[in-house]
């Protein structure tokens, strides 16, 4: 599954710039998620690495297997987002994406997504949507990112633990939705759409072939 992580992108070593901060976050990640399987290293100055952690998404109390990966950024939270004072939201965040295969395409997309708040002087929070002009990854017709928060216990604990310079760090899960689903959220509100996800047993792992629920 990790064959598309090509050297020098695939590396278990933490490079020198900002290594202390990145290493501290990685230690928290690995405490909850286990040892990482790979890292897509960011050679840039505003460093945002993407770690891949293997996971069986079937709960321990259930039978079967649903193997995939947790992709998690490391470095987005180094910069505060431009959160309006009246919003009362966290000013720092890291992004998480549940995927079947930890491909370089998806990991690079996730890293780019983590740069958007600083580049565009904006912010991401629970329920925010980011429409794109075209599907951001191959194999899907969906063009809009939707940010939610984790419902899986280890991922929630990461969010409860992370902090930078006294600021709590929010973990936002990445989802892709259809144009019609996007319009439903704008028309009926986020809660109505979340109810629709529950009714359709929305899969934890990103499925590019998922059909629109609207």
What spans do the regions from the language model cover?
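Acidic, proline/glycine-rich low-complexity IDRs
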Residues: 1-214
